[in-house]
């Protein structure tokens, strides 16, 4: 509605879905729609290329001075990593919470020094709906088989050794591959040095079972990951620390493995994660390009067909 009436004329995001994606794809947006990776977005903000006039940041808890945390309230999301760049560089910052707590709300994920206003509302969201769609573990036999193939590739590569590092996407097969990998790690007595995420329960289970030294977290995709934030070896990192290609050190460049999903993969190994075969914007690239560029071994899990549409093709849609 706001795109069609001209209220919104430009969009910068890591991806869009649903009616917004349809509106952009149909040419209803008057200006540009720029799709950036997680690292690309924070680079644009920190470099000044993207100027934010005002940032509205949903935070599960906040004190009256503006110290924000992703836990401790009724709508916990875990960490606030992707909002940190906005808070640090926007001209004005508004923290929106449904749980106002006593000062000081420490350790703060976003500091009071960056927040101009605190607004209290009845509800900022429903944490029960955090794990939906792609972020749910799969029970599909085909995807479980794909996950097993992926795991076999990982464990037979030269990078699978004590102290390796690892990240998966949130596709069902990617999540399942972590479960099967954990079993082989236990059998071979191999320990992971660090796991990176977007995190889900299987990765957090590695921490609980003492199969990984530390987790580095930018986003939590289920309630188990949200709860895991309380673990002293579960560290939050900013989007800049995670994947900004222009800073002096990004975590993605220290990855051994990254397991990703895709809408399409072509015969030249190009991947499309944003646009459907019908030309509609229907997904988000997130950290896909960042991790694929940084990791020693990037693995993309995709079926031959997505429904009735070929996922393996001569040329990707985009």
Label each residue range with its predicted role.
Residues 1-318:
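Conserved alpha/beta enzyme-core scaffold
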């Amino acid at each position: 509605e706001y795109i069609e009436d001209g209220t919104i004329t430009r969009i910068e995001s890591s991806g869009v879905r649903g009616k917004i994606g349809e509106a952009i794809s149909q040419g209803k947006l008057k200006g540009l729609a720029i799709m950036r990776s997680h690292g690309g977005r924070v680079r644009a903000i920190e470099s000044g290329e993207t100027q934010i006039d005002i940032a509205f940041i949903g935070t599960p808890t906040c004190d009256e001075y503006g110290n924000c945390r992703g836990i401790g309230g009724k709508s916990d999301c875990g960490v606030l990593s992707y909002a940190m760049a906005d808070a640090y560089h926007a001209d004005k910052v508004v923290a929106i919470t449904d749980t106002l707590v006593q000062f000081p709300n420490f350790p703060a994920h976003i500091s009071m020094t960056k927040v101009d206003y605190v607004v209290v509302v009845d509800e900022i969201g429903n944490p029960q709906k955090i794990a939906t769609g792609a972020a749910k573990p799969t029970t599909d036999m085909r995807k479980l088989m794909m996950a097993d193939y992926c795991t076999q590739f990982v464990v037979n590569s030269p990078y699978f050794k004590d102290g390796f590092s690892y990240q998966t996407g949130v596709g069902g097969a990617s999540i399942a591959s972590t479960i099967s990998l954990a079993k082989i790690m236990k059998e071979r007595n191999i320990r992971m040095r660090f796991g990176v995420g977007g995190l889900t329960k299987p990765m957090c289970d590695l921490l609980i079972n003492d199969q990984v030294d530390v987790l580095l977290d930018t986003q939590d995709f289920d309630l188990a990951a949200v709860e895991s934030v309380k673990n002293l070896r579960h560290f939050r990192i900013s989007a800049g620390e995670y994947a900004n290609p222009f800073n002096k050190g990004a975590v993605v460049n220290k990855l051994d493995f990254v397991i990703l999903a895709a809408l399409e993969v072509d015969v030249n190994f190009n991947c499309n994660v944003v646009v459907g075969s019908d030309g509609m914007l229907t997904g988000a690239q997130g950290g896909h390009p960042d991790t694929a560029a940084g990791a020693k071994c990037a693995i993309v899990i995709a079926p031959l067909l997505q429904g009735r549409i070929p996922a393996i093709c001569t040329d990707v849609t985009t």
